[in-house]
């Protein structure tokens, strides 16, 4: 198992966001996390990549509030819950946040170089850049354009490309289709499949259930911070109550 999350609990003050949650992801899998808004999907990604622990320190310093984390996150046999977020990145576990969030005042190519800040050898950086350009030709065409002027679809390509620049082993991608037109959503999902085909493991949070079930090897359904179902898209769609109550289908 490449990634194992065991009995994870996250509380913001007294609000329980994740409750005794456990999941696993095998190497080179594409696994999705689906469920209603507020189920805890994005919090799970942030906990895996060390951002909840970082938020805990910021919250304590700024407001005196508390964020409680329990449970374990293990990646390639090493405990990620015991090391800070920047060390988690060095292990090859990358978070690609929702709403894309490029450095808006920087050019496309400078955004991409920012994603490669851990790589010391210039040749590796250039090799990665060429691979990103092969996957996303539009980024090469827009390389000197300020990223804040890109379309929503182009910004999503940039977010994925920036994450790929660090040579990740596992990418946690949070709602990549949010706010995109249907034709752009289709294009983004095609690119996500291409990334998986490169041998990169993917853990994907997505609201577009009908599409993600077609491309994911397995899916976890979350509700109120708990896993309530797991299986292939075909298996989950056979459950009428699950389909109507939790998946909105």
Regions found by a protein language model. Give the residues of each.
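Glycine-rich phosphate-binding loops of nucleotide-dependent enzymes
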Residues: 2-249
